[in-house]
Amino acid sequence: VIGGVECNINEHGFLALLYSRRFQCGGTLINEEWVLTAAHCDMRNMYIYLGVHNVSVQYDDEQRRYPKKKYFCLSSRNYNQWDKDIMLIRLNRPVRNSAHIAPLSLPSNPPSVGSVCRVMGWGTITSPQETLPDVPHCANINILDYEVCRAAYPELPVTRRTLCAGILEGGKDSCNGDSGGPLICNGQFQGIAYWGADTCAQPREPGLYTKVFDYTDWIQSIISGNTDATCPQ
């Protein structure tokens, strides 16, 4: 996260670290057995840490898990094509809630343009050169009109299952390593970080976030055992 500050140790109990030999992505614990992240964060030999604040300090209640099963939203038969950048991971066993671990519930209504949102992660705090912090950083950004992102990135599809969020004048943004992590607006989990410009936090080049609200039915169906649930078109 660019332009942020160290997150309060008590505000990110749902934030997961996804590793495969090294730190790759963030994720969000949505109940004791499930983590939501971005599809492009999928990797082999993944393991997931919860309850971490400083990566160089071991916490008593830190818990490590593996994916038992991964669910994707594939919109076509081309399995290499992530049209919808969302992945739901069932953990190999549930985590216990503790001082530093608590899930974040799914949103009950969609966010509105202008909402103030908190983005968080262990991604780089400088750009384009990368500096990975030991602690997660948090910043407040705004939901912007989707047309701001379409103007910045003309190749974007017209689809609205994506949130455009940032600061118009630049200076605060998610960045490399924050992918898969949450965007929280008015206390609700509204977005999953997935894409932005090569240099982060530039004016008029906001970040893109998968719109969690549009996928809540799909997520809840899978969690309740209907693993053939279809994604929103």
Swiss-Prot record:
| Biological processes, Gene Ontology terms | proteolysis
Q: Which residues are glycosylated?
A: 54
Q: Give the location in the cell.
A: Secreted
Fetch the SUPFAM superfamilies from UniProt.
Answer: Trypsin-like serine proteases (SSF50494)
Q: Where is the Peptidase S1 domain?
A: 1-224
Q: Which UniProt keywords apply?
A: Disulfide bond, Glycoprotein, Hemostasis impairing toxin, Hydrolase, Protease, Secreted, Serine protease, Toxin
Coiled-coil ranges (or none): none
List S-S links within the chain. Answer: 7-138, 25-41, 73-231, 117-185, 149-164, 175-200
The active site annotation covers 40 (charge relay system), 85 (charge relay system), 179 (charge relay system)
Superkingdom of the organism of origin: Eukaryota
A single GO CC term for this protein reads: extracellular region
Q: In which tissues is it expressed?
A: Expressed by the venom gland.
GO molecular function, one example?
A: serine-type endopeptidase activity
Known EC number(s)? 3.4.21.-
Q: Which Gene3D superfamilies match?
A: Trypsin-like serine proteases
Primary site of residence: secreted
Subunit structure, per the record? Monomer.
Q: What does this protein do?
A: Snake venom serine protease that may act in the hemostasis system of the prey.
According to its UniProt record, which protein family does this protein belong to? Belongs to the peptidase S1 family. Snake venom subfamily.
- Protein name as annotated: Snake venom serine protease ussurase
* Organism, scientific name: Gloydius ussuriensis
